[in-house]
């Protein structure tokens, strides 16, 4: 029998559905979970051979949290626009005066890679401080070849610097590049012919996303991008049905999407197509709150048809300027009436599915990477009850305690 590196005893844990289990033990060897289950069934040789033991005193251990939808890499901020919004100035007027997403695009283009790292790293570290061990980071504030690739390179570097697993998503189809104003189709053609192949060839993109909406890209344009991604063997995601029902979720499902995100205006047909594709619904309560939206995502429908629900921060300067996944968990339970187990699964197992990583992370199961968080609480409901609190007692990444 092999000796194990770490033995965690007397713990409360959660399963993949978010249900809490008591009197649990976890055996860790070579960065992965060697055994887990009820402590009274723990094989004796693990007790005898463990190099290190930790009595958790009944405290909660969860998988490392996963933020599966962020726009963490950008320069500057839009606090001045927020002041104008509070004074009643419309988004259209703000955009006409040079604000909105294109202001972030300009600041991001003007920033060097070093400056982007300096501004973005604290955001990633703030997530890590909450027990987040895996983060998805999208591009989408470059909107040209040079700057989209720059954003993806920075995202990769941030993961290495912070000790957080980062998955990158190419979101060149976030808005039309300013050089192509009035000719969105020419921009889409350039994206498909030049930008996306370059991101693939440089191994900078793990997935491809499209903002499919009347103010962004049409169904036909989204399909062109999805087909290009498919040809490049890149999985897809979609900003879908956020402001209206365009059928983007059904289109994305047809291309085997990992996830469809936002979904406030999702209908039954779209939900059923997501079930067929095994796509995850990524709900973003931060954007719902910050934009003062009235239409909630159809959580009851998603439950009824069996679509898995994930939660993410959508961290970005325009519609969700937050770096707290814990706060999103509280918001999801309050705004969207999600149960405690649903919320816990949404930031662990379902979030791993949204990234196509469920075989390696997202749940406490034998063979998976030992990304774990030990909390100074015994009741899992506390993670949703408090606002952005408590912080982890300790976090483990791939079998090593990092905090």
Swiss-Prot record:
The subcellular location is:
Cytoplasm
One example of the protein's molecular function in GO is:
iron ion binding
> Which keywords annotate this record?
Cytoplasm, Histidine metabolism, Hydrolase, Iron, Metal-binding, Zinc
Q: Which residues bind Fe(3+)?
A: 69, 71, 239, 314
Predominantly, its location class is cytoplasm
Q: Which reaction is recorded as catalysed by this protein?
A: 4-imidazolone-5-propanoate + H2O = N-formimidoyl-L-glutamate
Q: Alphabetically, which GO biological process terms does the record hold? A: L-histidine catabolic process to glutamate and formamide; L-histidine catabolic process to glutamate and formate
At the top of the EC hierarchy, this enzyme's class is hydrolase
Task: Please give the Gene3D superfamilies that the UniProt record associates with this protein.
Answer: Metal-dependent hydrolases (3.20.20.140), Urease, subunit C, domain 1 (2.30.40.10)
Which residues take part in binding 4-imidazolone-5-propanoate?
Answer: 78, 141, 174, 242, 319
**EC numbers on record:** 3.5.2.7
Q: Which SUPFAM superfamilies match?
A: Composite domain of metallo-dependent hydrolases (SSF51338), Metallo-dependent hydrolases (SSF51556)
**In which residues is N-formimidoyl-L-glutamate bound?**
141, 316, 318
Q: In which pathway does it act?
A: Amino-acid degradation; L-histidine degradation into L-glutamate; N-formimidoyl-L-glutamate from L-histidine: step 3/3
Q: List the disulfide bonds.
A: none
Q: Which residues does Zn(2+) bind?
A: 69, 71, 239, 314
What family is reported?
Answer: Belongs to the metallo-dependent hydrolases superfamily. HutI family.
HAMAP family reported in the protein's UniProt record = HutI
**Protein name in UniProt:** Imidazolonepropionase
């Amino acid at each position: 029998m092999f000796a194990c590196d770490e033995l965690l005893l007397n713990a409360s844990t959660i399963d993949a559905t978010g249900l809490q289990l008591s009197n649990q033990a976890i055996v860790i060897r070579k960065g992965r979970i060697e055994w887990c289950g009820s402590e009274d069934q723990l094989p004796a040789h693990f007790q005898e051979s463990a190099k290190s033991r930790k009595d958790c005193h009944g405290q909660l251990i969860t998988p490392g949290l996963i933020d599966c939808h962020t726009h963490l890499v950008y320069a500057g901020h839009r606090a001045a626009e927020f002041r104008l919004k509070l004074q009643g100035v419309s988004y259209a007027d703000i955009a006409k005066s040079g604000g909105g997403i294109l202001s972030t695009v300009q600041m991001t283009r003007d920033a060097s890679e070093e400056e982007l790292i300096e501004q973005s790293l604290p955001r990633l570290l703030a997530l890590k401080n909450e027990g987040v061990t895996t983060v998805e980071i999208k591009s989408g504030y470059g909107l040209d070849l040079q700057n989209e690739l720059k954003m993806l390179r920075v995202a990769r570097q941030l993961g290495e610097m912070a000790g957080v697993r980062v998955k990158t998503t190419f979101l060149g189809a976030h808005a039309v590049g300013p050089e192509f104003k009035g000719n969105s189709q020419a921009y889409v053609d350039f994206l498909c012919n030049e930008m996306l192949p370059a991101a693939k060839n440089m191994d900078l993109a793990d997935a491809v996303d499209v903002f499919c909406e009347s103010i962004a890209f049409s169904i036909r344009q989204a399909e062109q991008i999805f087909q290009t991604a498919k040809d490049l063997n890149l999985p897809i995601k979609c900003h879908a049905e956020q402001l209206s029902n365009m059928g983007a979720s059904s289109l994305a499902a047809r291309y085997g999407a990992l996830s469809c995100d936002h979904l406030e205006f999702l209908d039954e047909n779209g939900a059923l197509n997501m079930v067929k594709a095994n796509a995850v619904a990524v709900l973003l309560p931060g954007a719902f709150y910050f934009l003062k939206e009235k239409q909630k995502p159809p959580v009851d429908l998603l439950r009824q048809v069996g679509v898995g629900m994930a939660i993410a921060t959508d961290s970005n300067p325009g519609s969700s300027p937050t770096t707290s996944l814990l706060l999103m968990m509280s918001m999801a339970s309050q705004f969207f009436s999600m149960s405690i187990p649903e919320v816990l699964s949404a930031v662990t197992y379902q979030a791993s599915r949204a990234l196509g990583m469920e075989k390696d992370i997202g749940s406490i199961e034998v063979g998976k990477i030992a990304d774990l968080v030990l909390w100074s609480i015994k009741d899992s409901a506390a993670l949703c009850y408090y606002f952005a609190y408590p912080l982890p007692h300790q976090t483990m990444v791939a079998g090593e305690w990092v905090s």
